[in-house]
């Protein structure tokens, strides 16, 4: 983290006092809340929209998720790569038990990228464009939580694309408020062991027993819908995913930069701090985030009706063939799953039964002890981007997120970092994270509050109002490191960056004024692509938070650490010269699989060129980056801890990495072959 412990200097006054030591111990008995955090039943009585919001004037922001793919490429422009955090075919990629929010997370990216008033329906008006999902970079949290321009996508045709959607506020109760916190968590002494084929919403690794397996938050009795109606989803992207604007000019969004840092020249200097192979002329385009912005064809687009008896004949013939094959495969799968079901009783625990079996999980719970004692996890990350599962509107009103699952996530996160970054305030996600920290008695854990900002004034006002409520309900606000108002709002503004920036700054000013009135001594910031930061935005923020993803620059894993350091130091660090403002890399990471990216507007000619997604490459980047960053005091957030399987829908033929950015799979298991450096025992503050 940026602070007095750096072994080098940026030659600017950005080295403020370190903040690790000013973390007040969490009162395990009293908790952080003046009042108990909201708690909810398994199923909210709200089955329809609480209200229909009218359109508000275009604000310059594109409604989108907090993460999406953005290209850091050799040429100017945005890459068409998209990032989904983790999706596994055949697994519960959409349910509340999956990391990132399942189907509820899908609503974020999809809903925000279209000119409709609500839900995934927006995808129907994209003129065939594939809009990438992103969390913080595109997508994250997050998540997601990073999305590149969709393949073949042109610029947005009209201001209609900026039109806000119907949304639901944080003031809407999620189920019965009096329900015990643990009641939301799927149950069983072991995490969900349901068959992966029981429901499309079952979590990855559901057949594996143990504390790293995600539980299904809903029973097989029909608590969770097997078919989602896109018309019922109105999402604002606060999970870190955002739609990526098409057609941004290469000249305005990507500029060639020297590769001195990537080289780690023998002469030393700032760039010599990160030793890696030289990357030639890397340029920066949009970087994929953690959101639903991932550019890909909408699953909701209806096929054009076919004509002709011959075509119908072929269809009927193929259908019969599929039925025969399906019967054979179904028999085999059924037998296998039947055996597994016999081996694992109590496979369909609901959230309420989890509470009955496990109560409100805490540090003394057996499965939590297992999660918090993994020798392969090391606390070497200054911060981690995180979006709880199932925190998207309005689906969370009917299917509330699970407190116990958040507690499990935080237990794992505590082995990696002392700082967690959130992307929004909807669905009581902040309260659940704080509750988990209290239950686990994590004295040093801190939280960066997140506020999602898009083109819908109602959404923005709701998010900010909930931010204020969280602060009012928190006894000891020293647990917070600050508030991040907006993630990649300028990136999502497309060509209307000027008006978007003006409105974003006005929201930041409003929050800052409120904090002054309440005597909250907390910094206000926003996060965006590294090359979207200019002096006027720096003036309005207390920190410069840049999303920097080497994978989308088309550089090799060996060049990645140097490229990241170089880009950040040449584009963002100089902006704070002569001030006491810190610079933070708000998102950086590498996918564990799914193809390769050769930079903005560059198509890879083979599968080994450019940035290759893979475990070996991920290990290479972490080996070069993590310990050196820890040693020289670089403050950054890693994207991300857990895969988000539901994002598989945003993968394309050549870009299948959207669901694979986590250090761990959706079941909280470290990916096979992945090695987190221990940095000689040194840990992040």
Curated annotation (Swiss-Prot):
Its EC number is 3.2.1.39. Residues 334-685 are extracellular. The active site is at residues 488, 587. Its main location: membrane. It is a single-pass type II membrane protein. GO terms for molecular function: glucan endo-1,3-beta-D-glucosidase activity. It catalyses: Hydrolysis of (1->3)-beta-D-glucosidic linkages in (1->3)-beta-D-glucans. Glycans are attached at residues 405, 428, 456, 632. Signal peptide: none annotated. InterPro entries: Beta-glucan_modifiers, Glycoside_hydrolase_SF. Residues 47-61, 73-90, 345-360 have a biased composition (Polar residues). The chain crosses the membrane at residues 313-333. Residues 1-96, 119-168, 180-202, 335-369 are annotated as: Disordered. One of its GO terms (cellular component) is cell surface. One of its GO terms (biological process) is cell wall organization. It is an enzyme of class 3 (hydrolase). It is found in: Cell membrane. Keywords: Carbohydrate metabolism, Cell membrane, Cell wall biogenesis/degradation, Glycoprotein, Hydrolase, Membrane, Polysaccharide degradation, Signal-anchor, Transmembrane, Transmembrane helix. Residues 1-312 are cytoplasmic. Glucanases play a role in cell expansion during growth, in cell-cell fusion during mating, and in spore release during sporulation. This enzyme may be involved in beta-glucan degradation. Active on laminarin and lichenan. Belongs to the glycosyl hydrolase 17 family. This is Probable glucan endo-1,3-beta-glucosidase btgC. It comes from Aspergillus oryzae (strain ATCC 42149 / RIB 40).
